[in-house]
Amino acid sequence: MSSSSNTSSHRSYGLRRSQRSMNLNRATLLAPPTPSSLYDANNSTSSTSSQKPNTSFTSLFGPRKQTTSSPSFSHAAPLHPLSPPSFTHSQPQIQAQPVPRRPSLFDRPNLVSRSSSRLGDSPSLSPVAQVANPIHHTAPSPSDVRAFPIHKNASTGVKRSFFSSSMSNGAMSPPSHSPSPFLQSSQHIPPSTPAQKLRKKNNFDSFRISNSHISPFASGSFSPFATSSPNFLSTSTPAPPNSNNANPSTLFSSIPSSRHTTSNHFPSNSAQSSLFSPTARPLTARKLGFASSQTKSAVSNNHSRNSSKDASFMMKSFIPSNRSHPQTQQNESSLFSDNSMVNSSSNSFSLFPNATLPNPPSSELLTTPFQQIKPPSQVFMSTGLLSKQHRPRKNINFTPLPPSTPSKPSTFVRPHSSSTDSPPSPSTPSNTQTDSYFIQRENTPTNHNSIPTIQLEKSSMDFLRFDPPPSAVKTSHNYGLPFLSNQRCPATPTRNPFAFENTVSIHMDGRQPSPIKSRNNNQMSFAMEEEADVSQPSSSSFTLSFPSALTSSKVSSSTSHLLTRFRNVTLLGSGEFSEVFQVEDPVEKTLKYAVKKLKVKFSGPKERNRLLQEVSIQRALKGHDHIVELMDSWEHGGFLYMQVELCENGSLDRFLEEQGQLSRLDEFRVWKILVEVALGLQFIHHKNYVHLDLKPANVMITFEGTLKIGDFGMASVWPVPRGMEREGDCEYIAPEVLANHLYDKPADIFSLGITVFEAAANIVLPDNGQSWQKLRSGDLSDAPRLSSTDNGSSLTSSSRETPANSIIGQGGLDRVVEWMLSPEPRNRPTIDQILATDEVCWVEMRRKAGAIIYEGIHGSSSNPQGDQMMEDWQVNV
């Protein structure tokens, strides 16, 4: 082998394609090891070769130590004399047990490597297809590594036979596996850059997975230095793509001229690991998904055996070499344009477990864990405040809990439809025969056919499921709905859970019920001789129920006292501190009034002066259209009585509750509520008084729908005397009243603003909590938009034209309410400033009816005929 002496006379060049695909047939390898035969082998071409040389040289000749100055080769084939030899470095190859072998042609002790530059010049030691084959994942032990790698001469006959058979059957392949597709390739692509120097790697480098199909580096980002490019963890001769039937010239037709190599590391237990890992693969311009149909069964079997290792804690998986390569990014650049594996969950791989999962169909989007845990949107409201719409109505069969202020009445009146147990509905009685009222015992004969009566009787206890406390009062029958039939029985100052036997029901009827058999004389009947007025329409009977306090001797004396001054005394409601009766004037029968009676007597002169102050303030405010007028006041038996005008439509809070069940009020009616209440408050402030308890419960509604401010129990002169303390409703009270006891006119402005806010937003005001704090801080983000036109109208656009200067839906209501709810009292407007705004002036000019009367989205029509119709309606009503 004379060529071995000239190893240092040539420079290293890249291997030619023909040199790396030489036909190492049996005849050439079995030829005698003479210099002439070696020279003939050098002149052989690779055009007729269709198989790749065997790369498992390590498994045949045992392990050897790899250094930067002594490259190891899988096998050596003679080079053409005119072709410049080239070499590449490979990483250390380890094998636990060397394979016994006979001395071969390459076993020459004189061919000890001296330097990497000189070894590359040897024509007989040309690395044709260097492929490193890592057998183990651990570092080599000193006992398994030789001191110097010795390059052998040509192998013997036995060795050549095994070498050739391993090439034809596929090196290191199990018997059940098909031959490697790499052995069928006839062309190879040489690297366009010199091989990189091998750098030292740690024990965990075998866990790294370098993706050759998806690389974050473009073709222009190549660096020849191993430390500057992560694509070069190790180098070797490039391997063709994994395909059986694909033509290499076709597969790499789109590869750019500058082909950079990347390394792929796969586990040693792979079926084709001896041929494929680690290899230098050209970086293609597009992602290639090569799936071999012939090796699919081998891959699936090998992958199933290593399934436990695939799910490693490092979130990486060892993929067989003929499987689809990892796919970690999509649509990042032109390099990732192959969509062959985008929707494949079995052949795709990602460093993130859920990144390559297929998208579920649209029908299953609601069955994801997040969708199941997330509560439905109906659970929460969009505003954070409770709406009055579609809320269960309050049961009017029992008295609501006492209010936080003595001004809020409790209604006992409830409708009572006729039934078989009750008499027919009579005509409304009128007092024409006599003006005298008397208490009549049941044993007193009465002409029941001509005299309607008001029957007071003890309510029945038949509906109770528990035995009540013993009582001397017993009733045989009741002709009305029992009071508190579904009562929850809260313990309040005016009600006792065990005082049902003293509950009274007032039955107003057109005829006398059947005689009541009473066992004692404690049952009373208030009979009133009246003449039936046939001109009035008939009305259904109703029942008035109130607690036992009204049936005591005190209530009897107060009722008898009212009967001496008025006629048709009817209890309208009862609160914690007062009771309200509806009475008729004994002279003017058409005049009706409301009488307010305090439940407690004067506790002393100071208490008496405080109560009389309310009377004096209401007297001073007499004569305004939006102030409840005081008619008279007197004292009797230590109780204070006040006679005021009657507002037939009740209070504003009841109207808002009933209307809120259906929908929100239209904006024009909200503006009318603001205007009328502001007009009454302006009169109060101009008289140098402050109300300090302004709320919908204290705003009364007349028969015409006009609003009037009443209940001046918390009112005071302005400026407020020092040391005065008032407690109002926490839902409407101003923040400075609670914090600093500042009783001033801005406190009334805040109460007016929160009242308008409740009417416009149709929400239940919070009495505490975060929402309560946000309202006091001027934050209305939890509330819906107040200025809106989504309330709708039954009138068409042709009959109801929108005015050119309409303020409806322009956001004016939101601005005014937010202005009135300013946290700082000095930042709130005065009542005169509110009434001077353009919106209020526009509403005042267009409104024709009361505040609660619907006049359309934009108020009354500008058509004079429409105004005349409105006036005729008011007259007829």
From Swiss-Prot:
Signal peptide: none
Family annotation (CDD domains): PTKc_Wee1_fungi
Catalytic residues (UniProt): D693 (proton acceptor)
Activity control mechanisms: Negatively regulated by phosphorylation in the M-phase.
Binding site residues for Mg(2+): N698, D711
Compositionally biased region (Polar residues): 36-73, 85-96, 179-190, 251-277, 319-332
Gene3D superfamilies membership: Phosphorylase Kinase, domain 1, Transferase(Phosphotransferase) domain 1
Record domain Protein kinase: where: 566-843
Binding residue positions for ATP: L572, G573, S574, G575, E576, F577, S578, E579, V580, K596
Primary localization class, coarse: nucleus
Region of interest called Disordered, as start-end residue ranges on this chain: 1-128, 165-198, 230-278, 319-340, 387-435, 775-808
Keywords associated with the record: ATP-binding, Cell cycle, Cell division, Kinase, Magnesium, Metal-binding, Mitosis, Nucleotide-binding, Nucleus, Phosphoprotein, Transferase, Tyrosine-protein kinase
Subcellular location: Nucleus
EC code: 2.7.10.2
Cofactor entry: Mg(2+)
Molecular function terms, GO-annotated: ATP binding; metal ion binding; microtubule binding; non-membrane spanning protein tyrosine kinase activity; protein serine/threonine kinase activity; protein tyrosine kinase activity
Post-translational modification remark: Phosphorylated in the C-terminal by NIM1/CDR1.
Residue ranges, compositional bias (Low complexity): 1-12, 113-127, 230-250, 407-435, 786-799
Cofactor binding description: Binds 2 magnesium ions per subunit.
Reaction(s) the record says it catalyses: L-tyrosyl-[protein] + ATP = O-phospho-L-tyrosyl-[protein] + ADP + H(+)
GO biological process: cell division; mitotic cytokinesis checkpoint signaling; mitotic DNA damage checkpoint signaling; mitotic G2 cell size control checkpoint signaling; negative regulation of G2/M transition of mitotic cell cycle; negative regulation of G2/MI transition of meiotic cell cycle; positive regulation of attachment of mitotic spindle microtubules to kinetochore
GO cellular component: Cdr2 medial cortical node complex; cytoplasm; medial cortical node; mitotic spindle pole body; nucleoplasm; nucleus
Purpose: Protein kinase that acts both on serines and on tyrosines. It acts as a dosage-dependent negative regulator of entry into mitosis (G2 to M transition). Phosphorylates and inhibits cdc2.
Assigned protein family: Belongs to the protein kinase superfamily. Ser/Thr protein kinase family. WEE1 subfamily.
Listed name of the protein: Mitosis inhibitor protein kinase wee1
Organismal lineage: Eukaryota, Fungi, Dikarya, Ascomycota, Taphrinomycotina
